[in-house]
Amino acid sequence: MLFRSKRATILDDEGAWFGFEQEYFFYKDGRPLGFPTEGYPAPQGPYYTGVGFKNVGSVARQIVEEHLDLCLAAGINHEGINAEVAKGQWEFQIFGKGSKTAADQMWMARYLMMRLTEKYGIDIEWHCKPLGDTDWNGSGMHSNFSTKYMREVGGKDYFEALMKQFEKNLQDHIAVYGPDNDKRLTGKHETAPWNKFSYGVADRGASIRVPHSFVNNGYKGYLEDRRPNSQGCPYQIASQILKTISEVPTSKKAAA
């Protein structure tokens, strides 16, 4: 009941679209899947979107594809999968229209992954920086978002005002973007420092990455907040994004 009552207070907007990119590690016997018993495998590089046994092993792809099928059968908008930067690290993407719908689907997708891996004797590590201060990437839940106004009206002035509001609300966002984010958002490994706000076109090292398509379309479309981490609550994340957006005046209404 407590969870349901909290969910009821979350800001929602059916015209707001969210795409969550959930990263995670497969773990076996307390180590990332594919790691040797001691030490580390070859450095990061070939694992990202990798293929072949030496890069992804023999079971991980079977699991992620089975998870995709389970999600689709459950009516979840599972949009894609890929091997991630670190060995044993993967990602799936969930899309939803409305913050509650998107968050509901992400929550269920996480649950299905954990239930699925039980039969393989594999654990899911959701921590955003399970390998600590090493040269291995952490895990995020990059949050792509847009409102009807952003998609249909937008404009450079509105975009710049929106970025100023995101900067002003930096601490409010970090507070709900997942625990231990200071360990992940260090300015290294494709992250921006947790205590500084930045944005840039196609910039993986920015707080908010701006797609080329957004700029080329007259500053209309979606944006990607790269700060939420893999442990973050999708309800709180989406709600805070909508709260910040709601604080920025709009010059005219989007089409009904």
Describe these PLM feature segments.
Residues 1-256:
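Glycine-rich, acidic/polar active-site loops that bind/position phosphate-bearing ligands
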